[in-house]
Amino acid sequence: MMQYTDMHDRYLLRLISKKIFLYTEMIATGSLIYGKCLDQLDFNKEEHPVGIQLGGSDINDLVECSKMSEQRGYDEINLNVGCPSDRVQKGKFGACLMLEPNLVGDCLKNMQDAVSIP
């Protein structure tokens, strides 16, 4: 969840449960590519396993961000196709992608081919 599941929240959740899989808040691909929120990629090594949740629909951007995420040590990459926010949907990601299953499939295929993590 945006503005909630930051590294401090995830660290607290890890203290509460060693078994849950943790995810970042949704991070827009454009924000990562243009360096606006690279600090959101940071996590504490005690958070593992931890996945990153990307928001985007441009295949090349998603591939680039997937590679960045793998290099940072994430265990998994998740593509957000559920955020109902109007602001997010104006950027053509989130829940509006449910209407474009072929695009989602192409995005996921290219992301999978680019990295070795799920």
Where is each model-derived feature located?
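Short glycine/proline-enriched coil/turn segments at helix->beta-strand junctions
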Residues: 18, 73, 113-117
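Alpha-helix-loop-beta-strand connector modules within alpha/beta enzyme cores
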Residues: 41-51, 94-118
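Short beta-strand segments
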Residues: 53, 78-82
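Glycine-rich, positively charged N-terminal anion/phosphate-binding segment
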Residues: 3-72
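A structural preference for short, pocket-lining loop segments at secondary-structure junctions
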Residues: 70, 77-78, 90
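Low-complexity, compositionally biased segments
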Residues: 9, 64, 81-83, 109, ...
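Glycine-rich, proline-tolerant flexible connector loops at the mouths of alpha/beta enzymes
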Residues: 26, 30-32, 81-101
